[in-house]
């Protein structure tokens, strides 16, 4: 069963996919979106869903450190509701506190990637971490 992980931001959506057995997550790509123009990347997402035969989604919830909802939580849930409606597939949510910080740390310490290059891959890596955390917790 393939699960797609998403890190939803206001300008990009990081995308990750699980292996067929649901053990590991791999970053796929970053989809550019524009909330103000109501462009949410659903066409590209549909292509990926078909290509990887996705059966469910995991979307990161950007909670605050004190476990309250950040302003982006509502946007992530709204995005999840759209996906559930468009694809008819279940959507789960995963606390994503510190995943972007962890992703940035990994890119600096392990890959020694410059700031400019980090911006191009950080959302994809964050989506991978969100999905891997979900897989570790549920499978």
UniProtKB/Swiss-Prot annotation:
Entry keyword annotation includes Amino-acid biosynthesis: no
Chief place where the protein resides: cytoplasm
Alphabetized SUPFAM superfamilies for the sequence: Ribonuclease H-like
A GO cellular-component term linked to this record: cytosol
Keyword Cytoplasm: yes
Keywords of the record: Cytoplasm, Hydrolase, Nuclease, Ribosome biogenesis
First-level EC class: hydrolase
Top-level taxonomic group: Bacteria
Subcellular location: Cytoplasm
The EC number(s) this enzyme carries: 3.1.-.-
InterPro entries documented for this protein: RNaseH-like_sf (IPR012337), YqgF (IPR005227), YqgF/RNaseH-like_dom (IPR006641), YqgF/RNaseH-like_dom_sf (IPR037027)
Paired cysteines (S-S): none
Gene Ontology biological process terms from the UniProt entry: rRNA 5'-end processing
An example Gene Ontology molecular-function term: nuclease activity
Similarity-based family: Belongs to the YqgF nuclease family.
Record's function text: Could be a nuclease involved in processing of the 5'-end of pre-16S rRNA.
Protein name per its UniProtKB record: Putative pre-16S rRNA nuclease
Organism name: Streptococcus pyogenes serotype M2 (strain MGAS10270)
């Amino acid at each position: 069963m393939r699960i797609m992980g998403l890190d939803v931001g206001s300008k990009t959506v990081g995308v990750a996919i699980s292996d067929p057995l649901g053990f590991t997550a791999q970053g796929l790509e970053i989809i550019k979106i524009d909330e103000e123009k109501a462009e949410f990347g659903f066409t590209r997402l549909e292509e990926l869903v078909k290509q990887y035969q996705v059966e469910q989604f995991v979307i990161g919830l950007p909670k605050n450190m004190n476990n309250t909802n950040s302003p982006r939580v509502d946007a992530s849930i709204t995005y999840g509701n759209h996906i559930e409606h468009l694809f008819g597939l279940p959507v789960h949510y995963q606390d994503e506190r510190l995943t972007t910080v962890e992703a940035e740390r990994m890119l600096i310490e392990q890959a020694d990637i410059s700031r400019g290059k980090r911006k191009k891959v950080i959302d994809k890596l964050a989506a991978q971490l969100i999905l891997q955390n979900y897989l570790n917790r549920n499978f």
